[in-house]
């Protein structure tokens, strides 16, 4: 997210006369912006945690070529097809990978990488992002876009996940359960229990099957247990209800 924002912010449209336009960007400017943003965010985290000791910083990236969720739901993120990344995105990402400790696993998104690392370093980590989906990962989450902190328990993370399955995500192009928004999702979970059956019942009421509910759950679920991904075989264990 930070690389995308930094690369996007330095783009400049140039008119060469008449109808000829091109888009230009200076990767060095984007890299400077990236470092400034990272420095500011790290300072906020350390101040909030009242911590002055050593720490590690890991940048997570999505696999740019494959995404296991598209094997589960072919239309996943289909609304982004044809949308170009910022002109210097690739150069800035490579620059970050050359200078920072970075993680990117085949077929996974950056969110999954964070979730797996969160499990590995449980109790000694802070998840930093501007993505609301991180509320489905147990642990300490700093939303730098809104300057908000969350301490999310396993129970709360599971509730947030079940709600997300029903709500869906227009940005990622999975629809969830028709007619259910955030308020309704919270109400049905409070009324009928924070269990998979509650989700299935809502899908069935909408004329959908448990299989369709499971499909939505598998794309909504952010990997957050190390056993969910085999780093040697690059194999994902898809989410299943308990």
Indicate residue ranges for each PLM-predicted region.
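Short secondary-structure boundary/capping segments
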Residues: 9-13, 73-77, 142-144
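Short loop/turn segments at strand-loop or loop-helix junctions that form parts
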Residues: 1-8, 58-65, 70-72, 181
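Non-catalytic, usually N-terminal nucleic-acid engagement modules in DNA/RNA processing proteins
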Residues: 1-58
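Conserved phosphate/metal-binding and DNA-contacting active-site motifs used
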Residues: 44, 51, 57, 66, ...
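Extended two-metal-dependent nuclease catalytic cores across DNA- and RNA-processing enzymes
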Residues: 18-21, 52-54, 78-241
């Amino acid at each position: 997210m930070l690389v995308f924002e930094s690369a996007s912010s330095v783009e400049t449209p140039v008119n060469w006369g008449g109808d000829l336009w091109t888009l230009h960007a200076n990767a060095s400017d984007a890299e400077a912006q990236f470092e400034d943003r990272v420095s500011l965010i790290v300072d906020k985290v350390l101040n909030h945690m009242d911590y002055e000791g050593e720490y590690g910083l890991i940048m997570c990236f999505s696999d740019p070529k494959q995404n296991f969720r598209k094997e589960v739901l072919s239309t996943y993120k289909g609304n982004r097809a044809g949308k170009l990344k910022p002109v210097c995105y690739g150069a800035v990402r490579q620059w970050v990978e050359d200078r920072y400790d970075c993680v990117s696993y085949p077929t996974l998104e950056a969110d999954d990488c964070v979730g797996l690392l969160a499990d590995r370093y449980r109790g000694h980590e802070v998840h930093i992002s501007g993505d609301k989906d991180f509320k489905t990962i147990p642990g300490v989450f700093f939303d730098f876009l809104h300057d908000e902190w969350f301490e999310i328990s396993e129970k709360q993370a599971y509730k947030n996940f079940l709600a997300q399955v029903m709500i869906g995500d227009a940005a990622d192009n999975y629809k969830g359960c028709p007619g259910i928004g955030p308020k309704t999702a919270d109400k049905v979970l409070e009324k009928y229990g924070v269990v998979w059956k509650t989700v299935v019942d809502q899908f069935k009421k909408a004329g959908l099957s448990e299989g369709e509910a499971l499909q939505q759950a598998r794309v909504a679920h952010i990997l957050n247990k190390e056993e969910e991904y085999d780093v040697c075989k690059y194999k994902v264990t898809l989410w299943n209800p308990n």
